[in-house]
């Protein structure tokens, strides 16, 4: 299973945004969800460690959504999103790992309290010296970046030599082989790569901590939710954070839990 996650996540968000804007804007009351006994989540079937249609490794988004549904006392229904599917046909209630920044999401999506910190970290090849911040990258250092990404613009200011990639899994493979010295990659992808490749791990540095544009928090995005549903999801998220459920789920995929 590949880690083509960043582009896949962007596709998911774009599709969901289109479907939200195309669909009639009316609330999905909490009582309606309780009455039907299920809540649905949008997810990509091939985007580990985020989500997968493999029952044995469903991805942390699916596991957290399932735990959330359990707290709400309902079943989880998964609505798989693939690029060829018309987004308007997807009618899910929630979207995990929704970036909680003003102005990014359409008005019809409400956000829960944040439950994880995300961003674009730096990974370093085995044996390579690390730096703590993007600005400390040395001139001539070969740094893998996603094509036309914000991270690529930040790396370009450092004097390092950018090497463009289309997918994170290709970048991490090149990094492990020493074809690049460092890479700007999501911490989740780095952690999962190290978990699944224990013989050739790469070093993770949370360099995004010094770059506001490359660090954010994520929340549950709720489509057309009423206030009682938002309140119920917030209570469920708080409980799953407090009892260690969310941290434990991330750990199963090699991902650091960084509580917002």
Question: Where do the protein language model's features map onto the residues?
Answer:
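N-terminal secretory signal peptides that target proteins for export/translocation
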Residues: 1-5
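Bacterial N-terminal signal peptides
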Residues: 9-20
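Bilobed "Venus flytrap"/periplasmic-binding protein-like clamshell domains
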Residues: 40-48, 55-72, 99-102, 121-171, ...
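Extended ligand-binding regions for polar small-molecule ligands
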Residues: 59-71, 128, 135, 141, ...
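Extracytoplasmic small-molecule ligand-binding "clamshell" domains
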Residues: 25-99, 103, 107
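Hydrophobic residues within well-ordered alpha-helices
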Residues: 68, 87-91, 137, 175-176, ...
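Periplasmic-binding protein-like
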Residues: 44-45, 116-124, 195-238, 254-260
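A ligand-binding cleft/hinge motif common to bilobed small-molecule-binding domains
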Residues: 85-89, 99-107, 154-157, 181-214
